[in-house]
Protein backbone atom coordinates (compact mmCIF):
# COMPACT_ATOMS: atom_id res chain seq x y z
CA UNK A 1 0.00 0.00 0.00
CA UNK A 2 1.28 3.46 -0.84
CA UNK A 3 0.13 6.83 0.46
CA UNK A 4 1.02 10.44 -0.25
CA UNK A 5 1.09 13.32 2.22
CA UNK A 6 2.08 16.99 2.19
CA UNK A 7 4.01 18.90 4.85
CA UNK A 8 5.58 22.28 5.31
CA UNK A 9 8.49 20.55 7.03
CA UNK A 10 9.69 16.96 7.00
CA UNK A 11 12.34 15.92 9.52
CA UNK A 12 14.32 12.80 8.63
CA UNK A 13 15.44 11.10 11.83
CA UNK A 14 13.95 11.23 15.33
CA UNK A 15 17.00 11.35 17.57
CA UNK A 16 17.48 14.31 19.94
CA UNK A 17 18.35 16.62 17.03
CA UNK A 18 15.44 15.45 14.89
CA UNK A 19 12.63 15.34 17.42
CA UNK A 20 13.74 18.68 18.90
CA UNK A 21 13.62 20.23 15.43
CA UNK A 22 10.22 18.70 14.69
CA UNK A 23 8.71 19.79 18.01
CA UNK A 24 10.07 23.32 17.62
CA UNK A 25 8.68 23.52 14.08
CA UNK A 26 5.27 22.47 15.38
CA UNK A 27 5.45 24.98 18.23
CA UNK A 28 6.09 27.68 15.62
CA UNK A 29 2.95 26.74 13.72
CA UNK A 30 4.47 24.64 10.94
CA UNK A 31 2.77 21.49 9.64
CA UNK A 32 5.44 18.90 10.44
CA UNK A 33 6.15 15.26 9.54
CA UNK A 34 8.77 13.28 11.49
CA UNK A 35 10.27 10.22 9.78
CA UNK A 36 11.90 7.52 11.92
CA UNK A 37 13.19 4.15 10.73
CA UNK A 38 12.59 2.45 14.10
CA UNK A 39 9.35 1.95 16.01
CA UNK A 40 10.19 4.42 18.79
CA UNK A 41 11.38 8.01 18.83
CA UNK A 42 14.64 9.07 20.46
CA UNK A 43 17.24 7.71 18.06
CA UNK A 44 20.52 6.19 19.15
CA UNK A 45 20.81 8.44 22.20
CA UNK A 46 17.61 7.45 23.92
CA UNK A 47 17.27 3.85 22.73
CA UNK A 48 20.81 2.48 22.40
CA UNK A 49 23.16 5.21 23.60
CA UNK A 50 23.16 8.06 26.11
CA UNK A 51 20.22 7.00 28.25
CA UNK A 52 20.62 3.20 28.59
CA UNK A 53 24.35 3.62 29.16
CA UNK A 54 23.67 6.02 32.02
CA UNK A 55 21.18 3.57 33.53
CA UNK A 56 23.83 0.85 33.50
CA UNK A 57 26.53 3.23 34.74
CA UNK A 58 24.29 4.07 37.69
CA UNK A 59 24.14 0.37 38.53
CA UNK A 60 27.91 0.09 38.17
CA UNK A 61 28.49 3.08 40.45
CA UNK A 62 26.30 1.66 43.20
CA UNK A 63 28.13 -1.68 43.02
CA UNK A 64 31.55 -0.01 43.24
CA UNK A 65 30.49 2.32 46.07
CA UNK A 66 29.11 -0.60 48.05
CA UNK A 67 32.46 -2.36 47.77
CA UNK A 68 34.43 0.78 48.67
CA UNK A 69 32.45 1.36 51.87
CA UNK A 70 34.02 -1.75 53.37
CA UNK A 71 37.12 0.36 54.04
CA UNK A 72 34.99 2.67 56.19
CA UNK A 73 33.36 0.00 58.29
CA UNK A 74 30.21 -0.74 56.29
CA UNK A 75 30.26 -4.21 54.75
CA UNK A 76 27.43 -5.30 52.45
CA UNK A 77 29.06 -8.48 51.24
CA UNK A 78 29.72 -9.36 47.61
CA UNK A 79 26.99 -7.83 45.38
CA UNK A 80 24.69 -10.36 43.77
CA UNK A 81 23.60 -9.25 40.29
CA UNK A 82 20.54 -10.41 38.38
CA UNK A 83 21.29 -9.51 34.77
CA UNK A 84 17.71 -10.08 33.65
CA UNK A 85 16.38 -7.63 36.25
CA UNK A 86 19.05 -5.05 35.42
CA UNK A 87 18.14 -5.34 31.74
CA UNK A 88 14.43 -5.01 32.53
CA UNK A 89 15.07 -1.86 34.56
CA UNK A 90 17.16 -0.37 31.74
CA UNK A 91 14.33 -1.08 29.28
CA UNK A 92 11.83 0.49 31.66
CA UNK A 93 13.87 3.70 31.67
CA UNK A 94 13.92 3.73 27.86
CA UNK A 95 10.20 2.97 27.58
CA UNK A 96 9.29 5.77 29.96
CA UNK A 97 11.23 8.31 27.92
CA UNK A 98 10.23 7.08 24.45
CA UNK A 99 6.62 7.02 25.59
CA UNK A 100 6.97 10.60 26.72
CA UNK A 101 8.29 11.62 23.31
CA UNK A 102 5.43 9.86 21.53
CA UNK A 103 2.96 11.71 23.73
CA UNK A 104 4.61 15.06 23.03
CA UNK A 105 4.60 14.40 19.29
CA UNK A 106 0.90 13.61 19.42
CA UNK A 107 0.15 16.64 21.55
CA UNK A 108 1.94 18.89 19.06
CA UNK A 109 0.19 17.22 16.10
CA UNK A 110 3.50 16.11 14.61
CA UNK A 111 2.76 13.25 12.21
CA UNK A 112 5.19 10.36 12.75
CA UNK A 113 5.91 8.10 9.77
CA UNK A 114 7.89 4.94 10.54
CA UNK A 115 10.23 3.56 7.91
CA UNK A 116 13.46 4.29 6.04
CA UNK A 117 13.32 7.58 4.17
CA UNK A 118 15.17 8.48 0.98
CA UNK A 119 15.00 11.52 -1.25
CA UNK A 120 13.55 11.15 -4.74
CA UNK A 121 13.69 14.83 -5.64
CA UNK A 122 14.25 18.31 -4.21
CA UNK A 123 10.77 18.32 -2.64
CA UNK A 124 9.93 14.64 -2.24
CA UNK A 125 10.89 11.91 0.18
CA UNK A 126 9.76 8.28 0.00
CA UNK A 127 9.52 6.31 3.23
CA UNK A 128 9.54 2.52 3.00
CA UNK A 129 7.90 0.96 6.04
CA UNK A 130 6.39 -2.34 7.12
CA UNK A 131 2.97 -1.33 5.83
CA UNK A 132 4.10 0.00 2.48
CA UNK A 133 5.51 3.27 1.20
CA UNK A 134 4.66 6.87 2.00
CA UNK A 135 5.59 9.74 -0.29
CA UNK A 136 6.12 13.01 1.57
CA UNK A 137 5.89 16.19 -0.47
CA UNK A 138 7.60 18.94 1.49
CA UNK A 139 8.39 22.63 1.34
CA UNK A 140 11.37 22.29 3.70
CA UNK A 141 13.38 19.32 4.94
CA UNK A 142 15.65 18.84 7.93
CA UNK A 143 18.09 15.93 7.68
CA UNK A 144 18.83 14.47 11.11
CA UNK A 145 19.75 10.93 10.11
CA UNK A 146 22.56 10.45 12.60
CA UNK A 147 25.49 8.07 12.53
CA UNK A 148 26.44 4.43 13.05
CA UNK A 149 29.44 2.59 14.56
CA UNK A 150 32.54 2.24 12.39
CA UNK A 151 33.23 -1.32 11.25
CA UNK A 152 36.68 -2.58 10.29
CA UNK A 153 37.02 -5.03 7.37
CA UNK A 154 39.29 -7.48 9.20
CA UNK A 155 36.91 -7.96 12.11
CA UNK A 156 34.19 -10.68 11.98
CA UNK A 157 31.30 -8.38 12.88
CA UNK A 158 28.79 -11.14 12.11
CA UNK A 159 29.98 -13.11 15.14
CA UNK A 160 27.72 -12.57 18.17
CA UNK A 161 30.78 -12.21 20.41
CA UNK A 162 31.99 -9.16 18.47
CA UNK A 163 30.04 -6.17 19.76
CA UNK A 164 29.40 -2.60 18.89
CA UNK A 165 27.98 -0.19 21.48
CA UNK A 166 24.41 -1.29 20.73
CA UNK A 167 25.29 -4.92 21.41
CA UNK A 168 27.08 -4.00 24.64
CA UNK A 169 24.00 -2.15 25.89
CA UNK A 170 21.76 -5.15 25.29
CA UNK A 171 23.42 -6.79 28.31
CA UNK A 172 22.83 -10.33 27.03
CA UNK A 173 25.71 -11.74 29.08
CA UNK A 174 28.72 -10.76 31.16
CA UNK A 175 31.89 -12.05 29.47
CA UNK A 176 34.69 -13.35 31.63
CA UNK A 177 37.25 -11.43 29.60
CA UNK A 178 36.31 -8.42 27.46
CA UNK A 179 38.55 -6.49 25.08
CA UNK A 180 37.54 -2.89 24.45
CA UNK A 181 38.95 -1.60 21.16
CA UNK A 182 39.23 2.16 21.55
CA UNK A 183 39.99 4.26 24.60
CA UNK A 184 37.36 6.89 23.86
CA UNK A 185 34.27 7.77 25.84
CA UNK A 186 31.98 4.97 24.61
CA UNK A 187 34.51 2.21 25.17
CA UNK A 188 35.50 3.41 28.64
CA UNK A 189 31.89 3.80 29.77
CA UNK A 190 31.05 0.27 28.67
CA UNK A 191 34.25 -1.02 30.24
CA UNK A 192 33.16 0.63 33.50
CA UNK A 193 29.80 -1.16 33.37
CA UNK A 194 31.15 -4.61 32.58
CA UNK A 195 33.99 -4.36 35.10
CA UNK A 196 31.46 -3.66 37.84
CA UNK A 197 29.43 -6.67 36.69
CA UNK A 198 32.45 -8.93 36.91
CA UNK A 199 34.32 -8.85 33.60
CA UNK A 200 38.09 -8.60 33.28
CA UNK A 201 38.68 -5.58 31.03
CA UNK A 202 41.50 -4.96 28.56
CA UNK A 203 41.52 -1.63 26.68
CA UNK A 204 43.62 -1.16 23.55
CA UNK A 205 44.21 2.40 22.30
CA UNK A 206 46.52 3.51 19.49
CA UNK A 207 47.28 6.92 21.04
CA UNK A 208 49.47 7.55 24.10
CA UNK A 209 46.45 8.29 26.33
CA UNK A 210 42.81 7.35 26.64
CA UNK A 211 40.23 10.07 25.85
CA UNK A 212 42.66 11.65 23.36
CA UNK A 213 40.66 14.89 23.04
CA UNK A 214 41.15 15.83 26.71
CA UNK A 215 44.26 17.43 28.23
CA UNK A 216 46.97 15.11 29.47
CA UNK A 217 46.96 16.35 33.07
CA UNK A 218 43.24 15.64 33.38
CA UNK A 219 43.55 12.22 31.76
CA UNK A 220 46.53 11.39 33.99
CA UNK A 221 44.32 11.63 37.09
CA UNK A 222 41.69 9.46 35.42
CA UNK A 223 44.22 6.89 34.20
CA UNK A 224 45.73 6.49 37.66
CA UNK A 225 42.33 5.43 39.01
CA UNK A 226 41.16 3.16 36.19
CA UNK A 227 44.51 1.41 35.87
CA UNK A 228 43.49 -0.42 39.04
CA UNK A 229 40.46 -1.81 37.17
CA UNK A 230 41.50 -2.05 33.51
CA UNK A 231 44.55 -3.37 31.73
CA UNK A 232 45.42 -0.40 29.52
CA UNK A 233 47.42 -1.08 26.37
CA UNK A 234 48.32 2.37 25.03
CA UNK A 235 50.16 3.07 21.76
CA UNK A 236 48.93 -0.32 20.64
CA UNK A 237 46.56 -1.41 17.89
CA UNK A 238 44.69 -4.54 16.84
CA UNK A 239 45.99 -6.19 13.68
CA UNK A 240 43.85 -9.32 13.45
CA UNK A 241 40.69 -10.77 14.97
CA UNK A 242 39.78 -14.44 14.56
CA UNK A 243 36.61 -16.08 15.80
CA UNK A 244 37.11 -19.62 17.10
CA UNK A 245 34.81 -21.97 18.94
CA UNK A 246 36.39 -21.30 22.33
CA UNK A 247 36.70 -17.52 21.95
CA UNK A 248 37.78 -14.50 19.93
CA UNK A 249 41.53 -14.43 19.32
CA UNK A 250 43.08 -10.99 18.90
CA UNK A 251 46.55 -10.11 17.63
CA UNK A 252 48.07 -6.72 18.40
CA UNK A 253 51.16 -4.66 17.70
CA UNK A 254 52.69 -1.70 19.46
CA UNK A 255 54.19 -0.61 22.76
CA UNK A 256 52.01 -2.76 25.04
CA UNK A 257 51.09 -5.53 22.60
CA UNK A 258 51.20 -9.09 23.97
CA UNK A 259 53.59 -11.37 22.11
CA UNK A 260 50.89 -13.94 21.35
CA UNK A 261 47.24 -13.63 20.23
CA UNK A 262 44.95 -13.16 23.22
CA UNK A 263 41.69 -15.06 23.76
CA UNK A 264 38.61 -13.05 24.76
CA UNK A 265 35.04 -14.03 25.47
CA UNK A 266 33.86 -10.86 23.72
CA UNK A 267 35.33 -7.88 21.86
CA UNK A 268 33.72 -4.43 21.92
CA UNK A 269 34.63 -2.35 18.87
CA UNK A 270 34.34 1.29 19.95
CA UNK A 271 36.59 3.19 17.56
CA UNK A 272 34.17 5.91 16.53
CA UNK A 273 31.12 6.52 14.39
CA UNK A 274 30.45 7.31 10.74
CA UNK A 275 27.63 9.62 9.50
CA UNK A 276 24.68 8.22 7.57
CA UNK A 277 24.78 10.84 4.81
CA UNK A 278 25.38 8.35 2.01
CA UNK A 279 22.33 6.24 2.87
CA UNK A 280 19.67 8.83 2.04
CA UNK A 281 19.98 9.40 -1.73
CA UNK A 282 20.45 13.06 -0.82
CA UNK A 283 21.94 13.66 -4.24
CA UNK A 284 18.47 13.17 -5.72
CA UNK A 285 17.55 16.40 -3.95
CA UNK A 286 20.77 18.11 -5.00
CA UNK A 287 22.30 17.97 -1.51
CA UNK A 288 26.07 17.58 -1.48
CA UNK A 289 27.45 14.79 0.71
CA UNK A 290 31.22 14.46 1.17
CA UNK A 291 33.20 11.26 0.79
CA UNK A 292 32.88 10.47 4.52
CA UNK A 293 29.10 10.92 4.57
CA UNK A 294 28.98 14.37 6.19
CA UNK A 295 26.72 17.15 4.91
CA UNK A 296 28.14 20.67 4.98
CA UNK A 297 25.90 23.43 6.34
CA UNK A 298 26.10 27.15 7.11
CA UNK A 299 25.42 28.81 10.47
CA UNK A 300 21.68 28.57 9.85
CA UNK A 301 22.04 24.81 9.26
CA UNK A 302 21.25 25.18 5.53
CA UNK A 303 22.79 22.75 3.06
CA UNK A 304 23.74 23.84 -0.45
CA UNK A 305 20.01 23.48 -1.26
CA UNK A 306 18.39 26.50 0.47
CA UNK A 307 15.19 24.76 1.65
CA UNK A 308 16.97 21.64 2.95
CA UNK A 309 18.74 21.75 6.31
CA UNK A 310 20.93 19.26 8.17
CA UNK A 311 21.63 18.88 11.89
CA UNK A 312 23.24 16.54 14.41
CA UNK A 313 25.91 13.92 13.83
CA UNK A 314 25.51 14.13 10.07
CA UNK A 315 26.95 17.67 9.89
CA UNK A 316 30.19 16.90 11.73
CA UNK A 317 32.00 16.73 15.02
CA UNK A 318 31.42 16.70 17.85
CA UNK A 319 28.78 13.99 17.55
CA UNK A 320 26.88 14.95 20.69
CA UNK A 321 23.16 15.00 21.39
CA UNK A 322 23.18 18.40 23.07
CA UNK A 323 24.84 19.98 20.05
CA UNK A 324 22.23 18.45 17.76
CA UNK A 325 19.34 19.72 19.88
CA UNK A 326 20.52 23.32 19.58
CA UNK A 327 21.12 22.89 15.84
CA UNK A 328 17.57 21.57 15.52
CA UNK A 329 16.15 24.63 17.24
CA UNK A 330 18.10 26.89 14.89
CA UNK A 331 16.90 25.09 11.75
CA UNK A 332 13.28 25.19 12.91
CA UNK A 333 13.37 28.88 13.73
CA UNK A 334 15.05 29.80 10.44
CA UNK A 335 12.35 27.90 8.53
CA UNK A 336 9.74 29.81 10.53
CA UNK A 337 11.27 33.07 9.35
CA UNK A 338 13.28 34.01 12.42
CA UNK A 339 16.86 35.26 12.31
CA UNK A 340 18.74 32.59 14.18
CA UNK A 341 22.26 31.19 13.94
CA UNK A 342 24.20 28.29 15.42
CA UNK A 343 27.24 30.04 16.83
CA UNK A 344 28.10 28.63 20.26
CA UNK A 345 31.33 29.55 21.96
CA UNK A 346 31.51 26.15 23.63
CA UNK A 347 30.13 22.61 23.45
CA UNK A 348 30.79 20.51 26.58
CA UNK A 349 32.13 16.95 26.46
CA UNK A 350 31.77 14.40 29.25
CA UNK A 351 32.94 10.84 29.85
CA UNK A 352 30.49 9.40 32.39
CA UNK A 353 33.05 7.04 33.86
CA UNK A 354 34.18 6.89 37.48
CA UNK A 355 35.74 9.32 37.92
CA UNK A 356 33.99 11.43 35.32
CA UNK A 357 36.09 13.43 32.87
CA UNK A 358 34.49 16.65 31.64
CA UNK A 359 35.75 19.60 29.67
CA UNK A 360 34.37 22.67 27.92
CA UNK A 361 35.83 25.45 25.81
CA UNK A 362 39.44 25.28 24.70
CA UNK A 363 41.81 22.62 25.92
CA UNK A 364 45.44 23.58 26.41
CA UNK A 365 46.31 21.77 23.20
CA UNK A 366 43.71 23.75 21.26
CA UNK A 367 44.84 27.04 22.78
CA UNK A 368 48.41 26.32 21.68
CA UNK A 369 47.27 25.39 18.18
CA UNK A 370 45.37 28.69 17.93
CA UNK A 371 48.38 30.66 19.13
CA UNK A 372 46.55 31.93 22.21
CA UNK A 373 48.68 33.02 25.15
CA UNK A 374 47.06 31.42 28.18
CA UNK A 375 47.54 30.51 31.83
CA UNK A 376 45.99 27.71 33.84
CA UNK A 377 44.82 27.48 37.42
CA UNK A 378 44.22 24.16 39.15
CA UNK A 379 42.43 23.40 42.38
CA UNK A 380 43.21 19.87 43.64
CA UNK A 381 40.33 18.06 45.30
CA UNK A 382 42.81 16.85 47.90
CA UNK A 383 42.23 20.31 49.44
CA UNK A 384 38.43 20.06 49.23
CA UNK A 385 36.63 19.23 52.46
CA UNK A 386 33.63 17.83 50.59
CA UNK A 387 35.82 15.68 48.35
CA UNK A 388 37.73 14.27 51.32
CA UNK A 389 34.50 13.59 53.22
CA UNK A 390 33.02 11.93 50.13
CA UNK A 391 36.13 9.80 49.49
CA UNK A 392 36.83 11.30 46.07
CA UNK A 393 39.81 13.53 46.81
CA UNK A 394 41.82 12.39 43.79
CA UNK A 395 39.93 14.77 41.48
CA UNK A 396 40.89 18.20 40.21
CA UNK A 397 39.33 21.29 38.63
CA UNK A 398 41.25 23.28 36.03
CA UNK A 399 40.45 26.64 34.46
CA UNK A 400 42.20 28.07 31.40
CA UNK A 401 42.44 31.85 31.10
CA UNK A 402 43.47 34.24 28.36
CA UNK A 403 46.75 35.61 29.68
CA UNK A 404 46.04 39.20 28.64
CA UNK A 405 42.34 39.63 29.42
CA UNK A 406 42.06 37.06 32.25
CA UNK A 407 38.83 35.81 30.65
CA UNK A 408 38.11 32.13 31.08
CA UNK A 409 38.43 30.31 27.74
CA UNK A 410 38.30 26.70 28.87
CA UNK A 411 38.00 24.37 31.79
CA UNK A 412 38.09 20.73 32.78
CA UNK A 413 37.08 18.63 35.74
CA UNK A 414 38.07 15.08 36.59
CA UNK A 415 36.28 13.60 39.56
CA UNK A 416 33.01 12.27 40.89
CA UNK A 417 30.06 14.02 39.19
CA UNK A 418 32.45 16.19 37.18
CA UNK A 419 29.91 16.46 34.37
CA UNK A 420 27.35 17.95 36.74
CA UNK A 421 29.85 20.61 37.87
CA UNK A 422 30.87 21.75 34.39
CA UNK A 423 27.91 23.99 33.59
CA UNK A 424 29.21 27.04 35.44
CA UNK A 425 32.40 27.02 33.39
CA UNK A 426 30.48 26.80 30.12
CA UNK A 427 28.21 29.67 31.11
CA UNK A 428 31.20 31.73 32.26
CA UNK A 429 32.84 31.35 28.85
CA UNK A 430 29.63 32.21 26.99
CA UNK A 431 29.15 35.31 29.17
CA UNK A 432 32.75 36.47 28.79
CA UNK A 433 33.55 36.18 32.51
CA UNK A 434 37.04 36.78 33.79
CA UNK A 435 38.75 35.15 36.76
CA UNK A 436 37.61 37.85 39.16
CA UNK A 437 33.94 37.38 38.18
CA UNK A 438 34.14 33.72 39.15
CA UNK A 439 36.31 34.20 42.23
CA UNK A 440 33.99 36.87 43.67
CA UNK A 441 30.90 34.72 43.15
CA UNK A 442 30.14 33.10 46.50
CA UNK A 443 29.98 29.33 46.10
CA UNK A 444 28.28 27.13 48.68
CA UNK A 445 30.54 25.28 51.12
CA UNK A 446 31.25 22.45 51.44
CA UNK A 447 30.58 21.41 47.85
CA UNK A 448 32.50 19.96 44.94
CA UNK A 449 31.06 22.82 42.92
CA UNK A 450 33.06 25.40 44.88
CA UNK A 451 36.22 23.98 43.31
CA UNK A 452 35.41 26.14 40.26
CA UNK A 453 35.47 29.30 42.36
CA UNK A 454 38.59 28.14 44.18
CA UNK A 455 40.40 27.51 40.89
CA UNK A 456 39.61 31.10 39.93
CA UNK A 457 41.01 32.22 43.30
CA UNK A 458 44.17 30.27 42.52
CA UNK A 459 44.53 32.32 39.34
CA UNK A 460 43.81 35.56 41.18
CA UNK A 461 46.26 34.71 43.96
CA UNK A 462 43.58 35.24 46.58
CA UNK A 463 43.04 31.65 47.68
CA UNK A 464 43.34 30.80 51.38
CA UNK A 465 42.65 27.06 51.01
CA UNK A 466 46.11 26.41 49.56
CA UNK A 467 49.55 27.59 50.73
CA UNK A 468 51.50 30.59 49.46
CA UNK A 469 49.35 32.09 46.71
CA UNK A 470 50.94 34.54 44.31
CA UNK A 471 48.70 37.54 43.74
CA UNK A 472 47.94 38.52 40.16
CA UNK A 473 49.01 41.92 38.95
CA UNK A 474 46.00 44.00 38.01
Per-range role (PLM):
Residues 10-21, 26-38, 44, 51, ...:
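Flexible, glycine-rich terminal cap/loop adjacent to redox cofactors
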Residues 111-114, 118-129, 136, 198-299, ...:
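A Rossmann-like FAD-binding core segment of flavoenzymes
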Residues 158-175, 261-335:
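FAD-site-proximal beta/loop scaffold in flavoenzymes
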Residues 10-12, 117, 136-146, 181, ...:
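Short hydrophobic core segments
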Residues 13-18, 146, 182-187, 272, ...:
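Conserved phosphate-binding and hydrolysis motifs of nucleotide-dependent enzymes
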Residues 50, 145-200, 204, 232, ...:
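Glycine-rich dinucleotide-binding loop and its adjacent helix/turn
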Residues 2-7, 17, 23-174, 207-211, ...:
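Glycine-rich flavin
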